[in-house]
Amino acid sequence: MERQKISEKFSELREKKEGALICYVMAGDPSAEKTGEIVKALVNGGADIIELGFPFSDPVADGPTIQVAGQRSLAAGMDTQRYFELIKNLDVGIPLVCMTYYNPVFRYGVEKFVEKAADAGISGLIVPDIPVEEAADLKNSCEKHGLDLIFLIAPTTTEGRVQKILERGSGFLYLVSRLGVTGAREDVSSSTRELLSRVETGLPKAVGFGISTGEQAAEVRDAGADAVIVGSAFVKIIDEGKDVNERLEALAKELKSGIKRAS
């Protein structure tokens, strides 16, 4: 299907002087059919970009909420072929980003995985466990098929590595707002502000890991972020299984209005 490029989405939002809301959910949790409804609810709530997690049995960067979501997805039969079919069937008109660990990409074949991702309508790829120094093959395949390769930068990332990421990354930069794994937390840390001011780039800066309220989203936007990434707070609602779509849409609306208020 026709896919919107991430850069197009950010240009569109920049014209409106608006920040982006990037929503993460695990593909196939609790089922492929339900994922379609979940994505629609998030889009209705104001999501600008959707990140769809690819489940993996050893998710080193994920907090407990997302780990359990991955287990549910795998138990429901999610695999590479079904993942791409699911993506192909999503007709949402906004960029879709695949978040996956490197092992499934490597096992499937880097070139083949990226080609299938592009064919399915994916605009970008996030692979949190591949160092930028080892990502040449992946980067080449992404460039060949028109996908953005998005890297993570943490407060502990060295200056040398930050420079390599700025040279090789595209789409947006994923800034990790605190140390440790993903999960909803209470306040926006000073390390987030320091990281935003430290990284100088023309690429949009998206802050993730730990944001769960409109207030936090507004704070992150005020601190200089171009986008806010929210995952665990949505996955928790899916996990609870009660009034899921209504609550997802309501939370997305709250987050988006926080981002708009700060803009």
Swiss-Prot record:
PROSITE patterns named in the record: TRP_SYNTHASE_ALPHA
Enzymatic class: lyase
Active-site residues from the entry: 51, 62
Gene3D superfamilies in UniProt: Aldolase class I (3.20.20.70)
Enzyme Commission no: 4.2.1.20
Keywords linked to the UniProt accession: Amino-acid biosynthesis, Aromatic amino acid biosynthesis, Lyase, Tryptophan biosynthesis
Catalytic activity field: (1S,2R)-1-C-(indol-3-yl)glycerol 3-phosphate + L-serine = D-glyceraldehyde 3-phosphate + L-tryptophan + H2O
Annotated family: Belongs to the TrpA family.
Role: The alpha subunit is responsible for the aldol cleavage of indoleglycerol phosphate to indole and glyceraldehyde 3-phosphate.
Quaternary structure note: Tetramer of two alpha and two beta chains.
Protein name per UniProt: Tryptophan synthase alpha chain
Source species: Methanosarcina barkeri (strain Fusaro / DSM 804)
